[in-house]
Amino acid sequence: PYIDLNTYGVMNCTHAAIDGMCERGHGRIVTISSGAGTVGIPLGITAYGAGKGGGIAFMRHLAMEVAATGVTANTIAIGMIDNHTDPSVTAHMAKTVPVGRLGQPHDIAALVVYLASDEASWMTGQTLELNGGSVTT
């Protein structure tokens, strides 16, 4: 199921929109993935990480195929996000993040807005790690 959702899901959704973007000569594709798709994590999530990695690889290749059409394709690989679980769990998890807190939805939204803007027209094929410094590249 992880490959179906996290790889083929990205591919199918992107294919539904890409032709129109290429015909118009402008478009921004931004996918949300996970740091588990870029680095190994010893938490028993191998299949999940492989699925996320497949979606990331797809976006990198797609970016090269459509770059000359004015369409960009980038991925945001997020780290731990505060999903309002048990406060003691959240506090423990936050201690493992170098900036000292978990991500918030607005952290992701700000980067999506930038990547979808004309200011990001020269950025394509990138996987941006958004994780409070937990993984650096």
PLM regions and their residue ranges:
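Active-site Tyr-X3-Lys motif and surrounding loop/helix of classical short-chain dehydrogenase/reductase
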Residues: P1-D4, H92
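Active-site helix of classical SDR
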Residues: T14, G51, M59
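Alpha-helical segment proximal to the catalytic Tyr-Lys
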Residues: D19, M64-E65, S121
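Residue(s) in the substrate-gating loop at a strand-loop-helix junction
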Residues: S34
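Short C-terminal tail/terminal secondary-structure segment
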Residues: V39, V113, T124-T137
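Active-site loop-to-helix junction immediately N-terminal to the catalytic Tyr of the SDR YXXXK motif
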Residues: G40-G49, H61
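Short, small/polar-rich loop/turn modules that mediate ligand/substrate recognition or access, typified
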Residues: A67, T72, M123-G125
